[in-house]
């Protein structure tokens, strides 16, 4: 790749139909974990006009009122009137949940957490870069900020015409592999009929874009596409069917890193699609925070029923202060990559997952997001002797 290029990432709001589905799946997981930390949960959701379908495999001693929970999530997300695409108070909720297969259980559950086998085979990636304060790629970082601001203004009532469904996309210009300025911002937001297109355009620029995008990244040539199709009245599940796990690039690094293909939401941490990816981020972020590299990608892979990973790879894209092989050896010494130890060390058996389902699983330094800590950075730096 040329050192001078344009790179684009997108984010979506919590009212986007796919994100509504993710929230429902993770809310169900949280309610189960509150009662049963040893539950096995794989929960998928589909939302469409006037209905939500919840399906999957769950083995637990907990009891959850699925229908009530689903309706609450839909309403809390802002869908409290059929004119918005779905009404959480009156929508149909279909429950098609079954138990986890005994064949999987016998290979995964081993008694002690330390011996827990991976819930499935798979490969996961973690990534970090020193482009932004939270060590996330710039395009996804700013895309998330735009969507969080849209939600804030909608919920506060400051822009009362905003509705829950929205998307943002940011294109950054890189020079010598460093982000220099924003080339293009695309933002589409659902709205009610009371606002004109000019008023909407001006309000989005002034109250959303200018509030979160640093002035130094905007140039006279920066292009804006605000609701470029014109009217955006029909949104949410009415405009598009929503499904759990369809925003995996929004959930991670905006396309700036590889993705193993596995979604996160609705899965308990015995599923390495989730816990392995969280561990990958934890490792990569600590490597960059330690100054071992400016940019780092970590791959781990697992076999179903096996506690230890089958492979580990570190790639610093030529930015490492020591070799990638040396960093791999340090990772193996500092981080325990057994599935049960990941769950234990990152404290993943807590009801924290609905918070992860919007605005990215990575890059938000909330107390619950233990994989965002950089508590291993000094250990890595000392071991690397740099």
From Swiss-Prot:
Pfam families listed in its UniProt record: S-AdoMet_synt_C, S-AdoMet_synt_M, S-AdoMet_synt_N
Entry keyword annotation includes Cytoplasm: yes
Functional pathway: Amino-acid biosynthesis; S-adenosyl-L-methionine biosynthesis; S-adenosyl-L-methionine from L-methionine: step 1/1
Catalysed conversion reaction: L-methionine + ATP + H2O = S-adenosyl-L-methionine + phosphate + diphosphate
Keywords for the protein's UniProt record, in alphabetical order: ATP-binding, Cytoplasm, Magnesium, Metal-binding, Nucleotide-binding, One-carbon metabolism, Potassium, Transferase
Cofactor(s) this protein cannot do without: Mg(2+); K(+)
GO BP annotations listed: one-carbon metabolic process; S-adenosylmethionine biosynthetic process
Segments for region (Flexible loop): 100-110
Annotated Mg(2+) binding sites: 18
UniProt xrefs under PROSITE patterns: ADOMET_SYNTHASE_1, ADOMET_SYNTHASE_2
EC number: 2.5.1.6
Binding sites annotated in the UniProt record for K(+): 44
GO cellular component annotations of the record: cytoplasm
Subunit-structure text: Homotetramer; dimer of dimers.
Family: Belongs to the AdoMet synthase family.
Protein purpose: Catalyzes the formation of S-adenosylmethionine (AdoMet) from methionine and ATP. The overall synthetic reaction is composed of two sequential steps, AdoMet formation and the subsequent tripolyphosphate hydrolysis which occurs prior to release of AdoMet from the enzyme.
Name of the featured protein: S-adenosylmethionine synthase
Species whose genome carries this gene: Francisella tularensis subsp. tularensis (strain WY96-3418)
């Amino acid at each position: 790749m040329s050192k001078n290029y344009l790179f684009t990432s997108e984010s979506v709001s919590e009212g986007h139909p796919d994100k509504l589905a993710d929230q429902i799946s993770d809310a169900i997981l949280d309610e189960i974990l509150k009662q049963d930390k040893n539950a096995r949960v794989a929960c998928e959701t589909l939302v469409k006009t006037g209905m939500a379908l919840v399906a999957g495999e769950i083995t637990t001693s907990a009891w959850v009122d699925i229908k009530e929970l689903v309706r609450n999530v839909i309403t809390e997300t802002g869908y409290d009137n059929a004119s918005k695409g779905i009404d959480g108070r009156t929508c149909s909720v279909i429950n098609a949940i079954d138990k986890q297969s005994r064949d999987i259980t016998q290979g995964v559950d081993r008694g002690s957490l330390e011996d827990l086998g991976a819930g499935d085979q798979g490969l996961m990636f973690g990534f970090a870069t020193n482009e932004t304060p939270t060590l996330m790629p710039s395009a996804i970082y700013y895309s998330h900020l735009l969507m969080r601001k849209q939600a804030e203004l909608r919920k506060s009532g400051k822009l009362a015409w905003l509705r829950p469904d929205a998307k943002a996309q940011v294109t950054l210009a890189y020079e010598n592999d460093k982000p220099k300025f924003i080339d293009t911002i695309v933002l589409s937001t659902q709205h009610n009929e009371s606002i004109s297109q000019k008023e909407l355009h001006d309000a989005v620029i002034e109250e959303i874009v200018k509030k979160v995008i640093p002035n130094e990244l905007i140039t006279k040539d920066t292009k804006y596409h605000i609701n470029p199709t014109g009217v955006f009245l029909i949104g949410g599940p009415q405009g598009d069917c929503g499904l759990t796990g369809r925003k995996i690039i929004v959930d991670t690094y905006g396309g700036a890193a590889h993705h193993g293909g596995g979604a996160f939401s609705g899965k308990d941490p015995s599923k390495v699609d989730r816990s392995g990816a969280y561990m990958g981020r934890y490792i990569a972020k600590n490597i960059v925070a330690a100054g071992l590299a400016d940019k780092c990608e970590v791959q781990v892979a697992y076999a179903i029923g096996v506690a230890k990973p089958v492979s580990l790879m570190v790639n610093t894209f030529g930015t490492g202060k020591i070799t990638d092989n040396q960093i791999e050896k340090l990772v193996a010494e500092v981080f325990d990559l057994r599935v049960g130890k990941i769950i234990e060390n990152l404290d993943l058996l807590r009801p924290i997952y609905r918070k992860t389902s919007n605005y990215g699983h990575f890059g938000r330094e909330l107390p619950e997001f233990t994989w965002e800590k950089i508590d291993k950075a000094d250990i890595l730096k000392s071991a690397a002797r740099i």
